[in-house]
Amino acid sequence: MYPELTGFNTKSVTLYCDSGIAPGMAVALRADGIGAIPASGEKFCGICTDVRGRYITAALTGYAEATYSGTAPTVGYNTLAGDGNGNVCLNDAGRELLIAGVDTSAKKITIIL
């Protein structure tokens, strides 16, 4: 049996955003509090959990599910950054975060921000 992490310590913010952001994508903060897809190698502030028109909800702390590109992270602590396309990827310039689960077939991870 796996532990249930949904909702664990989740703190979210609503941001006006660039188009193209979808749930599971990494989010970076731009001028005037606008959410955007982080550039390749850029640290991200959270993971998009919902989209309503031009507004997104982004989890800044706690549990989130994210899409990844490149080499699959492993369960445990990994250093992640944006890949420039909305996914997270292994990158030494990123943030060290706890990965609680990896689904290699769907290219998704369960992450504790």
Regions found by a protein language model. Give the residues of each.
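Surface-exposed, low-hydrophobicity beta-strand/loop segments enriched in small/polar/acidic residues
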Residues: M1-L113
